[in-house]
Amino acid sequence: MGRLHDYLRGAPDGVAALVSVELCSLTFPTVKPTVSGLVGTAMFGDGAAAVVAVGDRRAERLGATGPDILDSRSRLYPETLHIMGWNIGSAGMQLVMSPELPAVVEKHLADDVTGFLAAHGLTTGVVGAWITHPAGPKVITAIAATLDLPAEAHELTWRSLGEVANLSSASVLHILRDTIAKPPPAGTPALMLAVGPGFGSELVLLRWH
């Protein structure tokens, strides 16, 4: 979403599409399966999502509704390559997911989110919608704890995880769809938040109109 925003800033009359296709079942350990490998892949599902967005001038002409993308931020955390990813070899793709993952989230994410919001004169308390990637129960819990969020902030995230599992990058777009279906009031700021291999985080600031 951040890159979509970057493109449309330079093309205010343009239309752009973002497509995510995730085949997480490719990591299913058919050769020398392990308990950790089976448990890890059981958290994931195959999925796809697409977003069509327009530049500012086109949106104004169309009278478009929904969220505006205000800003984005990407962070890559040092010495965290082992936290999440894949090992690719002759037996296929092997999922890598360290038990340290929630601790890494707790260590880094709060400063990133609060600093990003502060740059726009905002705090976590005024964010009306949290569109958070369902990276797993422990990670969702860690995000909520480190940001001191109320239980209802991640209602759609928990629902998505329970209904379709973790669809990798497509998941946060599915949660965006559900948020758009029952939008917050006009003028409400919202934050899209995802974590992934690297290990890193992606933040996208939205505002409904």
Name each model-derived stretch:
Residues 112-120, 171:
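Stable alpha-helical structural segments in soluble proteins, enriched in small hydrophobic residues
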Residues 18-39, 71-89, 136-145, 166-174:
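Active-site-adjacent elements of ketosynthase-type condensing enzymes
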Residues 1-9, 106, 110, 128-209:
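Claisen-condensing/thiolase-fold acyl-transfer catalytic domains that form or cleave C-C bonds
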Residues 6-14, 54-65, 121:
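Secondary-structure boundary elements
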Residues 10-16, 38-39, 47-48, 64-66, ...:
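Short coil/turn connectors at secondary-structure junctions
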Residues 30-107, 111, 115, 195, ...:
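Condensing-enzyme catalytic core mediating Claisen C-C bond formation in acyl metabolism
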Residues 89, 118-119, 126, 146-150:
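Membrane-interfacial loop- and helix-cap regions that link adjacent transmembrane helices
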Residues 15-22, 53, 192-196:
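Short beta-strand segments
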